[in-house]
C-alpha cells in the first residue's frame, strides 16, 4: 500500500536571481524537508450517544476537536444503535476524507462502551486490528488494538493500544497492559507502539508510589509523554493526570515532536458548564514529525551552494 509523502517541487533558479535573492534560510528548509506533524489523539468523550450529538453546540465542538487529529481514539462511546459515529462523520467529511473503526460494546455489566478510531483516510490506513483476548478477565474494557500506516519512510507504521481503565482496578489493568504490548509484538513484530487513553492514573485511583512501580514505568523503552502533574480534567475542582500516552520504539522516539493535553474550553472560549456538556476530560495528543531527508541531486545542491557565496561575501 503506497504511503502519502509530503510533496516537494525542485527547480534550479536562474543564476543571476540566485546570486542576489537567495539566503541560507531557504537552503535549510530544503535540506530539512517538511515540518508537518502527524497528530494522534485520545479522548474520553463522556458517554457519547446519538442524542448527545443532536445538541448543536456539542456537535460543533466535537467536530472542531476531531478535525485537529489525523487519528483520534474515542472512549466512552456508549450508543448501541450503530448510528452515532456515522452521524459524526457526516459533519467531519465536509472538507476531508475520514473513516472509522470500532470495537464491539465492552464491559462486565449492563453499562458498556466502545473504542472508536476516527482517522484521516487520505493520510493513513488500517493494516490490521484485533480485540485483545483477555482470558483472565483483567480488563473491564480490553484493548482494541489497531495497526496504522504512517506517511513516513522512517516510521512506515505504528500500533495503537487504547485503554480506558476502571478506577477500582487501575494498577492491575495498567500492569496487564505490558502483556498486551508483548502480544502485539509477537503478532506483528513491530516495536513502535503507542498506548493511550483514560488510564485513571492519578489522584485517588493511583497513588504516586504505585504509579512509579508499574511495569510500564520500570521496564526499559516506555516513555510517558504526558507529564505527571499535567491536569487532563475539565473541572476547576480537580487536578489529575488521568489521561496518558505511553510511547515505545526507536521509530516513535526519532519522530516524536510534541505531546500535550488540548485545553478545548480555553481554545473555544467555553465556560466550564459548556465544556462539561462535551466531556469532563481534555483530549491528549502526540505529534510525530513527517519530515524526511530530501533527495536532491548533488550537482543541483553544489550549484545552489555556489550561488549563495557571493551574497554571503558582499
Curated annotation (Swiss-Prot):
- Taxonomic lineage of the native organism: Eukaryota, Metazoa, Chordata, Craniata, Vertebrata
Q: Where in the cell is it found?
A: Endoplasmic reticulum
Where in the body, by tissue, does this protein show up? Highly expressed in heart and skeletal muscles. Low expression in brain and thymus. Intermediated expression in other tissues.
Disulphide-bonded residues: 203-240
Q: Might you give the EC number(s) for this enzyme?
A: 3.1.21.-
Q: Where is the signal peptide?
A: 1-37
BP terms from Gene Ontology: DNA catabolic process
Which residues are annotated as active site? 113, 164
> Where does it primarily localize?
endoplasmic reticulum
Protein name, UniProt field: Deoxyribonuclease-1-like 1
Question: Gene encoding this polypeptide?
Answer: Dnase1l1
Q: A GO molecular-function term, please?
A: endonuclease activity
Amino acid at each position: 500500500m503506497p504511503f502519502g509523502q509530503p510533496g516537494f517541487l525542485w527547480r534550479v533558479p536562474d543564476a543571476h536571481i540566485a546570486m542576489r535573492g537567495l539566503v541560507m534560510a531557504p537552503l535549510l528548509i530544503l535540506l530539512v524537508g517538511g515540518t508537518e506533524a502527524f497528530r494522534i489523539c485520545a479522548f474520553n468523550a463522556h458517554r457519547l450517544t446519538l442524542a448527545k450529538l443532536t445538541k448543536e453546540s456539542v456537535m460543533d465542538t466535537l467536530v472542531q476537536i476531531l478535525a485537529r487529529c489525523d487519528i483520534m481514539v474515542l472512549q466512552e462511546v456508549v450508543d448501541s444503535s450503530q448510528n452515532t459515529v456515522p452521524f459524526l462523520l457526516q459533519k467531519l467529511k465536509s472538507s476531508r476524507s475520514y473513516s472509522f473503526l470500532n470495537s464491539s460494546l465492552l464491559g462486565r455489566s449492563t453499562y458498556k462502551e466502545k473504542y472508536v478510531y476516527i482517522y484521516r483516510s487520505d493520510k493513513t490506513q488500517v493494516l490490521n486490528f484485533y480485540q485483545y483476548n483477555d482470558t483472565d478477565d483483567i480488563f473491564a474494557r480490553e484493548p482494541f488494538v489497531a495497526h496504522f500506516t504512517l506517511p513516513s519512510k522512517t516510521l512506515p507504521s505504528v500500533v495503537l493500544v487504547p485503554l480506558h481503565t476502571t478506577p477500582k482496578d487501575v494498577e492491575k489493568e495498567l500492569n496487564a497492559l505490558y502483556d498486551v504490548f508483548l502480544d502485539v509484538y509477537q503478532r506483528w513484530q513491530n516495536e513502535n507502539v503507542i498506548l493511550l487513553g483514560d488510564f485513571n492514573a492519578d489522584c485517588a485511583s493511583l497513588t504516586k508510589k504505585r504509579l512509579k512501580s508499574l511495569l510500564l514505568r520500570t521496564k526499559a523503552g516506555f516513555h510517558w509523554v504526558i507529564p505527571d502533574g499535567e491536569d487532563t480534567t475539565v473541572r476547576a475542582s480537580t487536578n489529575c493526570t488521568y489521561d496518558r500516552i505511553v510511547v515505545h520504539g526507536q521509530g516513535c522516539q526519532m519522530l516524536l515532536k510534541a505531546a500535550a493535553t488540548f485545553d478545548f474550553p480555553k481554545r473555544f472560549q467555553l465556560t466550564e458548564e459548556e465544556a462539561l456538556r462535551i466531556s469532563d476530560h481534555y483530549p491528549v495528543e502526540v505529534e510525530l514529525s513527517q519530515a524526511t531527508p530530501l533527495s536532491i541531486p548533488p550537482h543541483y545542491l553544489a550549484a545552489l551552494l555556489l550561488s549563495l557565496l557571493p551574497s554571503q561575501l558582499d
